[in-house]
Amino acid sequence: MSANNPSCASRDPPPKKVRTFFSSIRRLSRPICIDDFIDITADLGDTIGAALKSFQQNNACTQEQSEQFTREVYDVCKNILQENKFRNEMFGFVADMNLLNLFALFRSYKQRVRTHFGKQLLCATASSQIIRFFLERVIRHTDKWFLLAPCNGLILPQELAKEMYVLLSEARGKALNQGRMFSGGRQNMMNAAKKVLTVYSSLRDDGEISPEVKAYMAYIFPVPDIEQVFQPLFKLEQEIRKGKATLTQSLLFAPRKRCPNKTVFSQYGARQRYVLPEVLLEASEPQSTLAYGCPDISSLLRDSSSTQENTDEESGPCCSKTLSPGVPQPQSEYDPSPTSPPDSDTESCDSQVRPESTDSDTHAEDDDVPEAPQAASQTQPTTTQETQSCCSVYNPATTQTGFYYNQQSSDNFASRIDASATSTSYGYPGPVTNHGFSTSVFSHTVPTTATGQQQLHQNMYGGGQQTTTYGSYVGGYSDANGQSVGASTSYYTSKPATSRSSTALQWTTLFPPASSSASSSQVSDYFSGFPYFPGSSTVPQAFEPLAPSTPSLLDELLDRDSGLVSQQQAPAPPQNDQGGPPQYVPVAQEQQQSSTDPLSDEMRRIFEFFDSVNPVTRP
């Protein structure tokens, strides 16, 4: 039929459409590009839209175009920060989300348009690393938002906490897929952030947001530093201009292992494998400068002006990389004298209760410290100078007092102890089990001299006239006859300790081994005698004194130089019929009876075996 139809036969086939590089770009509409940003004006939206359009057209660019586009993006980021200033305490939160959204758009366009014959923009090459930077900030700050509130007794609104948890879940989930396209996750995260701002604004209008919560939000979400983001970009642009680098060179940062290893069980719990935030990767050793105790930001919550001025997250008072003058600095060489606290009332970031002072001028400054509730006063004793010398943090939410003590090295600390002097008890860090952390608690007897060393410890610990017990450990001392005095089984006890000549260095713990000894060599092994039992939450009802550490006990048994071993044995009359050397038999048989500790029984059997095989002859 087509042959009989001349009009149909005369038609030519349609010409083929020649597809070029820029015609293949799928341009996104303005709502997709602009509507996901938070609190931007129409003029700023037009500027962002023009930058995105220029990014599409210059994806295959020259060196000059790349440098010019980097400067344009830098100006756009500064304008975004300027527009978000009216958010006050939520300024940093909104700025992080907007900048994350901007570079996520750059990355999404770069993934869609992959050119192989031209050089890409530097912002396109670095977009993945910049997204990683802002995404880690969101995860770190939201984690810190949940962690620091119970540490400072701050009650967060339930509605706001739910929406913040949704945002944290979205950020953690998308952090696992950083190598893939980020367009879908970008919109979900921005919607979750908008929901957080909507709930916070409604609660603030209803008067349910206290001034402490406002200051807390300003502290947790600091304003990002744009100079820190663009400084490596500008540096690379200068190297490209000088011929030292090319646009095809990618920005490579130091590799960091932040996600749990992939194993055969990963497919069963893939959604639980989250990127670990920075706040949970900090060191917790008391002797390091990166130590987190129980962070106290009560001073910042009372004064919101200081949080607004602090725009750098690495310079905050609770940052792990900064040390207060009150915290002793690590010494490069041996110093025989302990470091005493400074005279100024500057506190470390882990302390809330200041040490008591005998000066009348400093008592007036302690009035702003919040008082403990009545429930805590019935359980805890009155804090003395000795316990306040340690950095103390009071948690009204759990009615506990956690101690973060800056310990010196064991050698330096043991060198200041005189075993022949009086005894003084000191409290050591208490457990904080309600926050997911557990630290051993020790209350022990430390002998000090009556003159120089005692004065030295008074300056450092505040007198040392009272023995204090915290947690599930008790402390006491021994009199001249070796009888334990001052032992307690209560959970929180405090009683004065009189100065007596101590013949035993004793401490207590959850597992009661045999009795202790008074050898001066045990003091050098001072800290090694403290076992660590993480996660123990049971409080025993009875305690028995602990034996010294295993190396110290073996030295006594093998060297025969300890006074304790010499008191337990005496020479027996020689066997005239055999003519052998004099044998040593125990004098106090009641001391050789089987104890409740298997380790002590085994040590005694080893000692008896060596004594029977190779008896020692003494004059």
From Swiss-Prot:
- Keyword Cell cycle listed? The answer is no
Q: Which UniProt keywords apply?
A: Activator, DNA-binding, Early protein, Transcription, Transcription regulation
Q: Name one GO molecular function term.
A: DNA binding
**For the region Disordered, what residue ranges are annotated?**
301-389, 563-603
Q: Where is the composition biased (Low complexity)?
A: 371-389, 567-582
Q: Name one GO biological process term.
A: regulation of DNA-templated transcription
Q: Where is the composition biased (Polar residues)?
A: 589-598
In its keyword annotation, does this UniProt entry include DNA-binding? yes
- Family recorded in the similarity comment: Belongs to the herpesviridae TAF50 family.
Role of this protein = Transcription activation.
Any idea what this protein is called?
Putative transcription activator BRLF1 homolog
Name the species this protein comes from.
Answer: Alcelaphine herpesvirus 1 (strain C500)
Name the lineage.
Answer: Viruses, Duplodnaviria, Heunggongvirae, Peploviricota, Herviviricetes
Point out the gene that encodes the protein: 50
